[in-house]
């Protein structure tokens, strides 16, 4: 499983994206879904596909968004070997 995590500079995104911050996040989600990524929380997306070429393609697609490079503060990708969801334990 791979993950992509990013942080946008809100002021830069508001200035660079023609439709604003909410649409910027929607565009990112749409772009990453094309490569099998699912939003887990905030700006963290994961993908079950173990092909690193898919990961690189997703990042390149984000880079191709005209407003993204000038709006992103940080973007990281990493492999998740084990994933445990403790939500139901905490909520019970």
Swiss-Prot record:
Enzyme class, UniProt record, top EC level: hydrolase
Gene3D superfamilies to which the protein is assigned, alphabetical: 3.30.70.240
Subunit structure: Homodimer.
UniProt entry tagged with the keyword Transmembrane helix: no
Family statement drawn from the similarity comment of this UniProt entry: Belongs to the VapD ribonuclease family.
Entries under InterPro entries matching the protein: VapD, Virulence_VapD/CRISPR_Cas2
The keyword Hydrolase appears for this protein: yes
Residues in the signal sequence: none
Keywords: Hydrolase, Nuclease, Plasmid, Virulence
A Pfam match: CRISPR_Cas2
Entry's EC annotation: 3.1.-.-
GO molecular function (one): RNA binding
Ranges that cross the membrane: none
Known role: Cleaves ssRNA, mostly between U:A.
Protein name: Endoribonuclease VapD homolog
């Amino acid at each position: 499983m791979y993950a992509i995590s990013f942080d946008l500079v809100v002021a830069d995104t508001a200035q660079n994206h023609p439709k604003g911050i909410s649409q910027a996040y929607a565009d990112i989600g749409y772009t990453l879904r094309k490569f099998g990524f699912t939003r887990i929380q905030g700006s963290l997306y994961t993908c079950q596909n173990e092909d690193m070429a898919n990961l690189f393609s997703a990042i390149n697609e984000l880079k191709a968004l005209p407003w993204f490079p000038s709006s992103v503060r940080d973007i990281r990708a990493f492999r998740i070997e084990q994933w445990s969801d403790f939500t139901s334990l905490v909520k019970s």
